């Protein structure tokens, strides 16, 4: 009987299920979007029950579409939007509040208060690898416990559970039998110590989070539990791989070696560099995070998180309405010779790496009477590449060695104008893989390795092939001139939302 691996890819805007075979061919894909909830300015939520409903329905749908039963599934791998925080009742399984999404800035005030505490900023940097920011799960958990009536009392009694989205899905798939996360997701919470690989006692104390709420932290590739996808008493399918979306993409790009770099152009942009077993402390505003955890050992990575990448294209379409489809951007961007001196800094929810300014806001600078919509579309696209260059420069500065190329994936990597401009701007080769579903593929690899579907990383590396390569076509002088102007535009956006 032919066996397959199913990857559940739970993203910021949609839930997807993808079936892969042993040669990493995609056999089937199902996807459902779900609601984005914006209760106030800067707040972003999801309904956890809708996350679960859409994720489970696409799993059933893709199996039906491909005429595959649970007997054909060797294992399930899960990859997920990271940092997004869910707290639910251990006994009823009902979430006590909506999921607070990674983009949500509601805990900026909590972060400001924590920054006043003696030595805490440095402690967080040193032990969690992160910066003190509203982006991570820790302050989101605190907010829920402090603001949902009765939550803190229930948490103290051991009646509440916290999980990132992976934990929530595993808990639901196993009917509440398994409460786990993996090293990669734990490393994004700001309450996990990436040196001793344990939940950090001081951080739990500082944020007043009971340890009983927390999931057990496991390898990124092992059997965590079993999902029963059919009628009661049917075949139980092992859930055998978990990784946060960006780490899954790094693994799916076969970036197994020290110095390998990938950039995912999704809602945000996420540049990761594998630093092997070396925990590199960033001097440049990057995060030190766990790349993957296998066999009780971890590899580390440097990460630059850009909050608004492909989301700037959605903004052009949904808010400005100057394009009707995301794919139109490439056409309009090439209708003008250059950006006409226009720079878009899409700091809609603040600036991520390497600036970390929660109070920055979006700006468009350099407008003249001659500016038309094509200039704005082009400048918006270019902003994705500029932010990537900022992060890459910081990375190279931190590790002290250069890189040869960037492996790319994510929706916006389909835009050839953007990929060529990216190569021009960083002066490096940009390589697109044949399989661009690298996030789901990474989760599939992790699950497959745990059950012996693939034997080892070497077998996987042989399956990775490039589909397109982009080489730089402009001079260093020109790329630096462009970048200097961009930096000037960034300065204009900083601190905008601060009260006078």
Curated annotation (Swiss-Prot):
<dbReference type="Pfam" id="PF02782">
    <property type="entry name" value="FGGY_C"/>
</dbReference>
<feature type="binding site">
    <location>
        <position position="246"/>
    </location>
    <ligand>
        <name>glycerol</name>
    </ligand>
</feature>
<feature type="binding site">
    <location>
        <position position="314"/>
    </location>
    <ligand>
        <name>ATP</name>
    </ligand>
</feature>
<feature type="binding site">
    <location>
        <position position="415"/>
    </location>
    <ligand>
        <name>ADP</name>
    </ligand>
</feature>
<dbReference type="InterPro" id="IPR000577">
    <property type="entry name" value="Carb_kinase_FGGY"/>
</dbReference>
<feature type="binding site">
    <location>
        <position position="82"/>
    </location>
    <ligand>
        <name>glycerol</name>
    </ligand>
</feature>
<dbReference type="InterPro" id="IPR043129">
    <property type="entry name" value="ATPase_NBD"/>
</dbReference>
<feature type="binding site">
    <location>
        <position position="411"/>
    </location>
    <ligand>
        <name>ATP</name>
    </ligand>
</feature>
<keyword id="KW-0808">Transferase</keyword>
<feature type="binding site">
    <location>
        <position position="82"/>
    </location>
    <ligand>
        <name>sn-glycerol 3-phosphate</name>
    </ligand>
</feature>
<comment type="similarity">
    <text>Belongs to the FGGY kinase family.</text>
</comment>
<keyword id="KW-0418">Kinase</keyword>
<feature type="binding site">
    <location>
        <position position="245"/>
    </location>
    <ligand>
        <name>glycerol</name>
    </ligand>
</feature>
<feature type="binding site">
    <location>
        <position position="267"/>
    </location>
    <ligand>
        <name>ATP</name>
    </ligand>
</feature>
<dbReference type="GO" id="GO:0006071">
    <property type="term" value="P:glycerol metabolic process"/>
</dbReference>
<protein>
    <recommendedName>
        <fullName>Glycerol kinase</fullName>
        <ecNumber>2.7.1.30</ecNumber>
    </recommendedName>
</protein>
<dbReference type="InterPro" id="IPR018484">
    <property type="entry name" value="FGGY_N"/>
</dbReference>
<feature type="binding site">
    <location>
        <position position="245"/>
    </location>
    <ligand>
        <name>sn-glycerol 3-phosphate</name>
    </ligand>
</feature>
<feature type="binding site">
    <location>
        <position position="411"/>
    </location>
    <ligand>
        <name>ADP</name>
    </ligand>
</feature>
<comment type="pathway">
    <text>Polyol metabolism; glycerol degradation via glycerol kinase pathway; sn-glycerol 3-phosphate from glycerol: step 1/1.</text>
</comment>
<dbReference type="InterPro" id="IPR018485">
    <property type="entry name" value="FGGY_C"/>
</dbReference>
<dbReference type="GO" id="GO:0004370">
    <property type="term" value="F:glycerol kinase activity"/>
</dbReference>
<feature type="binding site">
    <location>
        <position position="12"/>
    </location>
    <ligand>
        <name>ADP</name>
    </ligand>
</feature>
<dbReference type="GO" id="GO:0006072">
    <property type="term" value="P:glycerol-3-phosphate metabolic process"/>
</dbReference>
<feature type="binding site">
    <location>
        <position position="267"/>
    </location>
    <ligand>
        <name>ADP</name>
    </ligand>
</feature>
<dbReference type="GO" id="GO:0005524">
    <property type="term" value="F:ATP binding"/>
</dbReference>
<feature type="binding site">
    <location>
        <position position="310"/>
    </location>
    <ligand>
        <name>ATP</name>
    </ligand>
</feature>
<feature type="binding site">
    <location>
        <position position="83"/>
    </location>
    <ligand>
        <name>glycerol</name>
    </ligand>
</feature>
<comment type="subunit">
    <text>Homotetramer and homodimer (in equilibrium).</text>
</comment>
<keyword id="KW-0319">Glycerol metabolism</keyword>
<feature type="binding site">
    <location>
        <position position="83"/>
    </location>
    <ligand>
        <name>sn-glycerol 3-phosphate</name>
    </ligand>
</feature>
<dbReference type="GO" id="GO:0005829">
    <property type="term" value="C:cytosol"/>
</dbReference>
<dbReference type="Pfam" id="PF00370">
    <property type="entry name" value="FGGY_N"/>
</dbReference>
<feature type="binding site">
    <location>
        <position position="13"/>
    </location>
    <ligand>
        <name>ATP</name>
    </ligand>
</feature>
<comment type="function">
    <text>Key enzyme in the regulation of glycerol uptake and metabolism. Catalyzes the phosphorylation of glycerol to yield sn-glycerol 3-phosphate.</text>
</comment>
<feature type="binding site">
    <location>
        <position position="310"/>
    </location>
    <ligand>
        <name>ADP</name>
    </ligand>
</feature>
<keyword id="KW-0067">ATP-binding</keyword>
<dbReference type="InterPro" id="IPR018483">
    <property type="entry name" value="Carb_kinase_FGGY_CS"/>
</dbReference>
<dbReference type="GO" id="GO:0019563">
    <property type="term" value="P:glycerol catabolic process"/>
</dbReference>
<keyword id="KW-0547">Nucleotide-binding</keyword>
<feature type="binding site">
    <location>
        <position position="12"/>
    </location>
    <ligand>
        <name>ATP</name>
    </ligand>
</feature>
<feature type="binding site">
    <location>
        <position position="135"/>
    </location>
    <ligand>
        <name>glycerol</name>
    </ligand>
</feature>
């Amino acid at each position: 009987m032919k066996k397959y691996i199913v990857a559940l890819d739970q993203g910021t805007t949609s839930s997807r299920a993808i079936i892969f075979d042993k040669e990493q061919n995609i056999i089937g894909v199902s996807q459902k979007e779900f609601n984005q909830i914006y209760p106030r300015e800067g707040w972003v939520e999801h309904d956890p029950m809708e996350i679960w409903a859409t994720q489970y329905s696409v799993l059933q749908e893709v199996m039906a579409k491909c005429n595959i039963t649970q007997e054909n599934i060797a294992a399930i791998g899960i990859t997920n939007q990271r940092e997004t925080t869910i707290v639910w009742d251990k006994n009823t399984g009902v979430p006590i509040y909506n999921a607070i999404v990674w983009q949500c800035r509601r805990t900026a005030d909590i972060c400001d208060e924590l920054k006043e505490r003696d030595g805490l900023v440095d402690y967080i940097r040193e032990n969690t690898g992160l910066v003190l920011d509203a982006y991570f799960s820790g302050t989101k958990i605190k907010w829920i416990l402090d603001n949902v009536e009765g939550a803190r009392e229930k948490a103290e009694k051991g009646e509440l559970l916290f999980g990132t989205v992976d934990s929530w899905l595993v808990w639901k798939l196993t009917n509440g039998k398994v409460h786990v996360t993996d090293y990669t997701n734990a490393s994004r919470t700001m309450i996990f110590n990436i040196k001793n690989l344990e939940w950090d006692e001081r951080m739990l104390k500082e944020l007043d989070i009971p340890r009983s709420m927390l999931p057990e932290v496991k390898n990124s590739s092992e059997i965590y539990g079993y999902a029963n996808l059919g009628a009661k008493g049917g075949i139980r399918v092992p859930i055998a791989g978990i990784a946060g979306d960006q780490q899954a993409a790094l693994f799916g790009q076969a970036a197994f070696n020290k110095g390998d770099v990938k950039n995912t152009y999704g809602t945000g942009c996420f540049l990761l560099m594998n630093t092997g077993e070396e925990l590199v402390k960033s001097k440049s505003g990057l995060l030190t995070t766990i790349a993957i955890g296998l066999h009780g050992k971890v590899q580390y990575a440097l990460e630059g998180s850009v909050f608004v990448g492909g989301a700037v294209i959605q903004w052009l379409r949904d808010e400005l309405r100057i394009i009707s489809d995301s794919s139109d951007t490439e056409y309009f961007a090439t209708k003008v010779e250059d950006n006409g001196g226009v720079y878009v800094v899409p700091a809609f929810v603040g600036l991520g790496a390497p600036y970390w300014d929660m109070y920055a806001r979006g700006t468009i600078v350099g407008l003249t009477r001659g500016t038309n919509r094509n200039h704005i579309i082009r400048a918006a696209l270019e902003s994705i590449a500029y932010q990537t260059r900022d992060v890459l420069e910081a990375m190279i500065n931190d590790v002290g060695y250069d890189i040869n190329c960037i492996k790319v994936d994510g929706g916006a990597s389909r835009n050839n104008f953007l990929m060529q401009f990216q190569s021009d701007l960083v002066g490096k080769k940009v390589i697109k893989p044949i399989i661009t579903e690298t996030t789901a593929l990474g989760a599939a690899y992790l699950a497959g390795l745990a059950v012996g579907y693939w034997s080892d990383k070497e077998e996987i590396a042989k399956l990775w092939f490039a589909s397109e390569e982009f080489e730089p076509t402009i001079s260093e002088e020109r790329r630096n001139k462009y970048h200097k102007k961009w930096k000037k535009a960034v300065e204009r956006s900083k601190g905008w939302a601060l009260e006078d």
